[in-house]
């Protein structure tokens, strides 16, 4: 109960601050070009942080949990990777004029977050951080 309350509080804080945390697969299927174009049109800027592990981790883990000895578990390629690699941040920049930045190393994250939030607050436009994680 306490953990759930804390989790809701964090979610509420992120929403009130205009921060969206999204996996790369969810980002692609959320029609990001429309999202960022509409945000620009209606002047509703937000910061979107994309967790980019290069594929669909949830379907992979679900399949392996249900069928650990199945044929797919032994396959070299499960077909859940994103190749060619999409330019997640570039989609938002092209469609909605968003500030776009790729964060390739953990040491860059803090300064990237500060710069992105400055753009959202000062320039009143969206910002997208494509945070690279270890691949699937």
Language model regions located:
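Thiamine diphosphate
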Residues: 1-136
């Amino acid at each position: 109960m306490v953990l759930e309350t804390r989790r809701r509080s964090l979610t509420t804080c992120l929403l009130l601050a205009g921060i969206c945390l999204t996996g790369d697969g969810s980002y692609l299927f959320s029609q990001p070009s429309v999202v960022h174009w509409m945000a620009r049109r209606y002047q509703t800027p937000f910061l979107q942080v994309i967790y980019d592990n290069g594929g669909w981790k949830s379907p992979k883990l679900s399949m392996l949990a249900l069928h650990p000895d199945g044929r797919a578990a032994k396959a070299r390629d499960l077909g859940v990777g994103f190749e060619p690699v999409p330019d997640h941040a570039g989609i938002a920049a092209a469609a909605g004029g968003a500030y776009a930045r790729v964060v390739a190393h953990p040491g860059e994250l803090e300064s990237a977050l500060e710069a992105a939030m400055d753009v959202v607050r000062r320039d009143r436009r969206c910002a997208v951080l494509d945070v690279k994680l270890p691949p699937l």
